[in-house]
């Protein structure tokens, strides 16, 4: 069954004429995340604060960046302009770091590995150039723009990820308390995986993998937006715009948006899903907004009433409640949040998501 609605034409026209950004957003190193990254624990009673209170350092080369991401202690690391990794590679990020971008900050041909760490913030950075021509499916190098392993309290905010090799943001090895917010994912295949493998310990994995995705812009991506094994995920106020393209792995059409597997509990609300359009829909080719999958199926529910999702030129979303009439999880048991009206999501997210949107005024006097 295809879900089609009359406001599609007006929405497309709106997006065409809102290509110019509405302006920068004032930001601070004291900003706090919304979502699971905000949840306090015994070792982090204020939730995720990154390197707040540590030395502020400005970096302009890959070597300078790695020097401080691998240093012990708190640091606020400011990426000033474009950093090119030659050869392409990943670098490790230790605990208690804030990495923020200024002056159209870019990381080209490089990725960040947050492994065995806690309390890391990454904001306002554009990632590109990590696609390996000799490894289009990411099987040889397995490079991710951001790879989170066995880590907790991570906030990834206002970043842009363009056509990478494997994952854009992958969350694995029992990582926990993570928020991905206001990011833009463009022309990427396997966008964001939560959970390393179907073979992970189900009890341990079920206690980990608490992840929030909100106000992200998925543009012409193919799958895993996100795909969750075990754990919990709250997916709200994201914009999915699925145009035709030739994907990294040879796919022409995006496949699915949010997927739940291995008993994961996923609640999807206030999102706007835009499929390929009328011609493809009438030909029987359509985008699947939510999917239940895996050798052990996951659970997934949709918001209702003021929290409903919108679906345009999409297949019927797949759902599987834990208990009929109840959401797969109640995020407000963990944190407070405010939903934007779903009809406003396309403009809000297109205008606000991605790198280059934040201005950190306190950094102007720190140089």
UniProtKB/Swiss-Prot annotation:
The keyword Secreted applies. Its EC number is 4.2.2.22. The active site is at 224. GO terms for cellular component: extracellular region. It catalyses: eliminative cleavage of unsaturated trigalacturonate as the major product from the reducing end of polygalacturonic acid/pectate. One of its GO terms (molecular function) is pectate lyase activity. The keyword Ion transport does not apply. Its main location: secreted. Optimum pH is 9.0. It is found in: Secreted. One of its GO terms (biological process) is cell wall organization. Residues 1-27 form the signal peptide. Its cofactor is Ca(2+). Ca(2+) binds at residues 144, 166, 170. Optimum temperature is 90 degrees Celsius. Half-life in the presence of 0.6 mM CaCl(2) is 110 minutes at 95 degrees Celsius and 15 minutes at 100 degrees Celsius. Half-life in the absence of CaCl(2) is 5 minutes at 90 degrees Celsius. Keywords: Calcium, Carbohydrate metabolism, Cell wall biogenesis/degradation, Lyase, Metal-binding, Polysaccharide degradation, Repeat, Secreted, Signal. InterPro entries: Pec_lyase, Pectin_lyas_fold, Pectin_lyase_fold/virulence, PEL. PbH1 repeats lie at residues 151-173, 263-289. Homotetramer. Belongs to the polysaccharide lyase 1 family. Cleaves unsaturated trigalacturonate from pectin. Activity is highest towards polygalacturonic acid, activity on methylated pectins decreases with an increasing degree of methylation. This is Pectate trisaccharide-lyase. It comes from Thermotoga maritima (strain ATCC 43589 / DSM 3109 / JCM 10099 / NBRC 100826 / MSB8). The lineage of its organism: Bacteria, Thermotogati, Thermotogota, Thermotogae, Thermotogales. The gene is pelA.
